[in-house]
């Protein structure tokens, strides 16, 4: 809000949360104190990279066609997450995913809520996304009161009716300032830092590209004015967040919701931050809002992001295929950064062997090599 005056909201990255908890702590056996130390060092490195314009150079090196593809991919990704959260799409061991049971209340209300939200958007109702969430939630409460929606805590079906209004937020004392550099070798520590660094760097750049493209922030050369401030804020948040006890803080993809509803300045990010603080007090109410109630907003925002697909040049396969791979892999790999990996590598290879190597710039080639090494070395 203050460094760059953009509507980009910062929060702990969900994918990085999973990597932090399941890969670093559960699988590799390191303590969360060590993982926080790695996040802290990663943040320091990001501050340095932002100060010397390395992250900005990477952002500017991404081809214009791929920037549009990132926006589309994020839209598909957001919509898929929304459908998955509501159970519209479920895991299937045979086909990976399949359609959920549309006769269940969460799935039915998610689909009904999506139609309601779209009607509100079409009729240009201000705050249509928020209104759609509230209407879907209220419909869920009605279903619970009518006995159609049955609470079963053991099965993960929770009450939609708040049991209180305000509660004191929990203390951060047990986790704040608990960084530790002991219990891990220097080599392993560097590997952990690099893993956090890679995912955070390209998740952040992907989000900035996608949301900026949708908002129309990019100039004629595909560059984002004042990007240095946005990247510095992101890096500083990661560093401070680690000290306070949270995993990597990043520019999160749901920023697209604010942009889709008209947000164009830092006031949007500032308002979101203030509301996050207020939400700490009203957790008894907010925690009862079910995931199926937020599905309509995510699906509609996804639709708005996908609109950029019409601007992608698919006639030239050296441009069209990398854009296609960016979109596809972002969704099927459940990762913004992995979408960029396959998009950039295919872009460089097709330009190189397709007789258009003069269209490559050194930075994108270096990025492609690093991406390739990342795939090989894991």
Where are these regions (language model features)?
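Generic alpha-helical transmembrane segments of integral inner-membrane proteins
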Residues: 40, 44, 48, 111-119, ...
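Helix-loop-helix junctions within the multi-pass membrane cores of secondary transporters/permeases
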Residues: 2, 13-22, 26-74, 211-308
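Transmembrane alpha-helical segments and their short flanking loops
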Residues: 15-29, 257, 270-378
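Flexible hinge motifs at transmembrane-helix junctions and intramembrane kinks/re-entrant loops
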Residues: 115-171, 197-201, 329-341, 350-363, ...
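Helix-loop-helix hairpins and the membrane-proximal interhelical loops
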Residues: 98-99, 133-228, 369-373
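Interfacial helix-loop-helix linkers and transmembrane-helix boundary segments
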Residues: 4-9, 32, 54-65, 124-128, ...
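Inter-helical loop and helix-membrane interface segments of multi-pass membrane transporters/permeases
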Residues: 22-35, 57-69, 76-119, 145-181
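Transmembrane alpha-helix interface/packing and boundary motifs in multi-pass membrane proteins
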Residues: 1-9, 119-124, 195-203, 234-244, ...
């Amino acid at each position: 809000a203050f460094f760059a005056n953009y509507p980009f909201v910062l929060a702990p990255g969900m994918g990085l949360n999973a990597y932090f908890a399941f890969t670093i702590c559960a699988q590799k056996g390191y303590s969360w104190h060590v993982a926080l130390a790695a996040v802290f060092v990663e943040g320091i490195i990001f501050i340095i990279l932002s100060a010397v314009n390395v992250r900005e150079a990477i952002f500017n090196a991404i081809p214009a066609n791929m920037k549009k593809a990132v926006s589309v991919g994020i839209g598909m990704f957001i919509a898929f997450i929304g459908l998955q959260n509501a159970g519209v799409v479920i895991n299937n061991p045979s086909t990976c995913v399949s359609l959920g049971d549309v006769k269940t209340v969460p799935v039915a209300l998610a689909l009904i809520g999506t139609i309601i939200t779209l009607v509100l958007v079409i009729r240009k109702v201000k705050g249509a996304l928020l209104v759609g969430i509230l209407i879907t939630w209220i419909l869920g409460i009605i279903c619970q009161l009518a006995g159609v929606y049955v609470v079963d805590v053991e099965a993960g079906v929770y009450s939609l009716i708040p049991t209180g209004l305000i509660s004191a937020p929990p203390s951060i004392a047990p986790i704040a300032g608990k960084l530790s550099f002991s219990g891990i070798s220097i080599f392993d520590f560097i590997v952990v830092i690099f893993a956090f660094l890679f995912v955070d760097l390209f998740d952040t750049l992907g989000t900035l590209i996608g949301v900026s493209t949708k908002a129309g922030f990019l100039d004629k050369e595909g560059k984002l004015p004042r990007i240095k401030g946005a990247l510095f804020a992101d890096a500083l948040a990661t560093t401070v967040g680690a000290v306070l006890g949270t995993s990597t803080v990043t520019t999160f993809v749901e920023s697209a919701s604010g942009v889709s509803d008209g947000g164009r300045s830092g006031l949007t990010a500032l308002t979101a931050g203030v509301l996050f603080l207020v939400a700490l007090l009203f957790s008894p109410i907010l925690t009862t809002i079910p995931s199926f109630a937020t599905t309509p907003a995510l699906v509609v925002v996804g639709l708005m992001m996908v609109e950029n697909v019409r601007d992608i040049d698919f006639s030239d396969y050296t441009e069209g295929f990398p854009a296609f791979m960016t979109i596809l892999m972002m969704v099927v790999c459940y990762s913004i950064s992995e979408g960029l990996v396959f998009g950039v590598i295919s872009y460089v290879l097709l330009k190189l062997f397709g007789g258009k190597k003069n269209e490559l710039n050194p930075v994108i080639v270096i990025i492609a090599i690093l991406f390739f090494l990342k795939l090989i070395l894991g």
